């Protein structure tokens, strides 16, 4: 029987750091994300799905699953996807420039530049050539 683990220190450092960031993003989104907020039902359901994707992606990477890496990549892009869908649904009064700033995560309604930096760093870690080559060769 194969041992299941939550963290695998034997993967390249890009994937090891990505695992930690995925867990941190998932926990912080659950604690401080406002699941019961005043957003539309579609956004709240997509938000819950992205939290599950963060945790499942990190767990899948730790257990050497190709599906885990793929879900982690989708989860890493989810903040930008959620903000884009949110602008399509709720923010018709935004100008085009304000919508772009909101989707990127900066501006008066965005999540903040520091959060955006960590979102981009997670994407870079998962799509780094070392991470991609490792998952192609070793993940099942």
Give residue spans per PLM region.
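Topology signature of small-to-medium multi-pass alpha-helical membrane proteins
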Residues: 1-140
């Amino acid at each position: 029987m194969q041992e299941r683990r939550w963290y695998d220190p034997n993967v390249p450092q890009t994937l090891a750091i990505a695992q930690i960031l995925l867990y941190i993003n998932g926990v912080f989104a659950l604690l401080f994300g406002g699941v019961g907020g005043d957003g539309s039902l579609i956004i709240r359901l997509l938000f819950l799905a992205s939290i599950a994707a963060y945790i499942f992606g990190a767990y899948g990477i730790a257990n050497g699953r190709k599906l885990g890496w793929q879900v982690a990549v989708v989860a890493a892009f989810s903040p930008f996807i959620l903000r884009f869908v949110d602008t399509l649904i709720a923010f018709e009064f935004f100008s085009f420039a304000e919508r772009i700033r909101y989707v990127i995560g900066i501006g008066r309604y965005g999540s903040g530049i520091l959060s955006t930096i960590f979102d981009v760093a997670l994407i870079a870690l998962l799509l780094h050539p070392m991470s991609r080559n490792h998952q192609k060769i070793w993940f099942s």
